[in-house]
Amino acid sequence: MLCLAVCTMTLAQAQDQLKVITFNIKSFENSNFDVKPFAKLLAEENADIICLNEVENRSARQMDPKTLKYRDVVQDLAANLKLFGVFGYSYNLMNKKGDEDESKYTFCQDELYGNAILSRYPILNINAMQLPRPANSADQRGVVTAEILLPSGKMVRVACTHLDHIGGQMEQAKVLVGSNVLSATIPTILTGDMNQWPGTEVIKLLDASYDRLCQEGKTYQAGSKLDYIYGSKGAFEVVEKRIAANVCDGVTLSDHFPVISVIKFK
């Protein structure tokens, strides 16, 4: 009876604990668009939720050289890791600057660029939306969200975003804070490359709105902390947090490092 109680408690604790990774993968460029090194690196971490930025999906330079067909690299990576995967596009690569009607490019679902979420557990609801694009920003940015059903029966919402690297980050962050992207009714995890370092007004806004759940220290090779994991206020406790290596089999996979947090529900 004691063993059953202990085992049940341990299982319940494990079900309420999540290992989360956020990683800007630089479009798979450094591996010549081969997802396998990324799959190997990420498989070693055995995470429950993986959020990816700078995801180039179904693009011409990712075509299968034998069949010359577009590849859904998000689903390729998800299959390699035996995870569920969703992709939310921010813009079409053929229309990067947004000078024309975006709708004419998106019907084919090819040449897309955005963010992705991979999950060990079933994804029930998905949403993707574009963020504001002020005149001083470089690219159209977006956020993809997924509501995930955990084994314990609890729901968690995961939002993966990538703010602009030139300007407009405050306008984009205000939309994240003010919209229903981060639901007040479902515990939410916000991840991504915010392109802002600690102490900036954008990060002060996010810090005031959510609990920061990630390790301090540089996440970008140039020396800045740009990548973050946040959670709904008071919803999560940090069990472990660190910044991991970005090298697999001697290949530096990105100019960013994976940011890893193990969290549990309070």
Language-model regions, residue ranges each:
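Acidic/histidine-rich, surface-exposed loop or edge segments in extracytoplasmic proteins
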Residues: 22-24, 51-60
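Acidic helix-start/capping segments at beta-turn-to-alpha-helix junctions
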Residues: 55-59, 90-96
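Active-site regions of metal-assisted phosphoester/phosphodiester hydrolases
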Residues: 2-3, 12-49, 69, 84, ...
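Membrane-embedded segments
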Residues: 58-76
